[in-house]
A protein has these predicted regions:
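Structural detector of well-ordered beta-strand residues that form the stable sheet scaffold
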Residues: 28, 73-74, 100, 126, ...
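Protein kinase-like catalytic core scaffold
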Residues: 125, 191, 253-256
Length: 288
């Protein structure tokens, strides 16, 4: 039986274990963080045939990958590509894929640069760290004073020498937008969810991240949304991808992507989700 390494032991591990075992793939946990990694002992490492998604901790992941020598369904380059929100926006725009109007700011810059960048948009605007996930650090600025206040905090973080990514995005705000996560496996949309805040949490809030209390409800993904998500995966060259879409009455745009998406309940995906995922894993292992 093929052995698949997962660097996560959370929801995705538990949800995909049995469906993949039924398709000839055994899953094991390849721990990449909160441990001591012996770098000079390859003999004692667990044996795997293929990795699922490269560890989010890139430094530890690179060391572990050297010890195990694995092919990955989504490799280090895929994770880096998707994590770079500004790079994704630029690449998709170049591919004629609709995205929000966005300016990337690379610190350190003067206040006048921020004012000029925001002047190209209209308030309110969204401010987000370029590399963070789960909606962490994302804020809405309703005017120039609030924007500059948010930027002050980002500047404090970016002043720390160990901060790797010293960039952030200023992005147009799409009011009352519906928020979708569409999954693409091996170039084909395999289902998706709409993310909504429950009624008791919705008052005065606009973020729809599941990690911030939103609920993900399975939907029949419309044809236009499917084509758009598939086009995103093709443009970025990533085989297993979560594509975040925002839809208003007039527009459908790609907001972000995730090359390390959490797998939701099977009922929220198309019937062939696990079949396609298993075939992708097996082909990745065979291509080495």
């Amino acid at each position: 039986m093929l052995r698949l390494a997962l660097s996560t032991h959370a929801e995705t591990f538990e949800r995909i274990r049995e469906p993949l075992v039924d398709r000839g793939i055994e899953i094991g946990h390849l721990q990449a963080k909160q441990r001591a990694i012996r770098l000079t002992d390859r003999e004692s490492v667990d044996r795997f045939d293929v990795g699922f998604v490269f560890p989010g901790r890139l430094m530890e992941g690179t060391a572990i990958n050297a010890l195990h020598g694995l092919p990955w369904v989504n490799n280090r380059e895929d994770v880096l590509t998707s994590r770079n929100k500004g790079g994704v926006i630029a690449a998709l725009h170049a591919a004629d894929i609709p995205v929000p109007e966005t300016v990337m700011v690379s610190n350190p810059v003067s206040e006048s640069v921020v004012i000029k960048a925001a002047g190209e948009l209209s308030f309110p605007v969204i401010v987000k760290p370029n590399s963070a996930t789960r909606g962490i650090g994302v804020a809405k600025a309703t005017d120039m004073d609030s924007l500059l206040g948010i930027v002050d905090y980002l500047n404090l973080v970016h002043d720390y020498r160990a901060t790797g990514d010293k960039s952030y995005l200023i992005q147009e705000y799409l009011p009352d937008a519906r928020d979708y996560r569409v999954m693409v496996v091996d170039g084909e949309c395999v289902g998706g969810v709409e993310r909504r805040l429950p009624e008791e949490l919705a008052e005065g809030r606009w973020k729809h991240n599941v990690h911030r209390g939103a609920e993900a409800t399975g939907i029949e993904v419309p044809a236009e949304h499917r084509r758009l998500a598939e086009g995103v995966a093709k443009a970025l060259g990533i085989s297993y991808l979560g594509v975040d879409l925002l839809e208003t009455d007039r527009r459908l745009v790609v907001n972000e992507t995730n090359a390390r998406p959490t797998v939701d309940a099977a009922t929220k995906y198309d019937d062939d989700f696990y079949g396609r995922l298993a075939e992708l894993i097996k082909r990745t292992a065979a291509d080495t």
